[in-house]
Amino acid sequence: MQKQIFFSFVLVMMLLGKVKAQHNNPFGNALIPDMIADASIQEINGVFYCYATTDGYGQGLKTSGPPVVWKSKDFVHWSFDGTYFPSAAKEKYWAPSKAIFANGKYYIYPTINGYMYPAVADKPEGPFKLARGKDEFYKPFTPSTLLQSKNPGGIDAEIFVDDDGQAYVFWGRRHVAKLNEDMITVDSVVQVISTPRKEYSEGPIFFKRKGIYYYLYTIGGDEKYQYAYVMSRVSPMGPFEAPEQDIISTTNYERGIFGPGHGCVFHLEGTDNYYFAYLEFGRRSTNRQTYVNQLKFNEDGTIRPVELTMDGVGALKKVKSDKKIKIDTVYASSIEVPLKIEPMKDPTCLRTEYFVPSFAVDGANGSRWMSAAEDSINPWIVADLGTVKK
């Protein structure tokens, strides 16, 4: 009898362990409740804007989602309203950069069908249109490209405006050039930034803090994505020097964070609080999400390696919000089978995503409920609020 009780106890504990495993969320609390990458985040007139590549369309680099800008007043609650670049809505749209205010207009520099284009609008939420020529796209390219080249020439534009008003454009493979005053043409002198690490690089980040210019560049890719940096005390075009500890983000095996790559650095206006946004390997290929952690500096101005987490940084501003209602139970018409995510370069990157109903209301943007494939006509989900409370 005691053996039977012991066996039953072990069986129950095994089942409880299985249930617990099924509720594991390997993707934590992403910034946005969507699959986005290559984020450029900025604060404009007290509102946070997040321009990014929309992922999750299941065809790798062959396609992308439409141009969408997410907005938030507190950095926690995000929303969007349609597409901000109508003519580019059906194109392959990547890495739109920050919106730069100049000449009474807002400019962005997305990579569209493999080419960088300047686009312009009256407001940061658009609608944007090509800054020169007809506002239309055709392949292989439209002659309104930033670099005015028949060859793709570069991707992932990053715009920096120095204190004297001079604008610079950085792009993949360590390139930099001055932008002319019209903000849509590039100075003929193009430089390649010398860095100690020579691997393929994209997703540049550039900013200035306390008189020091920082150039961040990616190396590797997929689960092996990393960010390294060099710094200059002279100008945005160098000369640059590499600190002894030049890697600021890399895979954190203990926390299950793989390939922290193309993102941005931003800071709160009027403060010295800096933040590092990065994409994470996610669900393999172009099915990524974006996370944000604090960026900290040493006394000599060098950057400390980022303490990567998937917890988020919480609210960056206080705004009045609705009272949260506690949910007692959540159940649904069906649950999609778990998704096993296979690694690409790192065999230790083994993940399983579950789609249980409770994930719809857990407050984490990295989890979700999905109905079973055969339940696609009229799926439903119910949140039980429990007994009536006054």
Put a short name on every predicted segment.
Residues 22-199, 208-255, 269-272, 279-319:
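Beta-rich carbohydrate-recognition and catalytic domains
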Residues 97-98, 259-265:
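Signature of short aromatic-glycine-proline-rich micro-motifs recurring in repeat-based ectodomains
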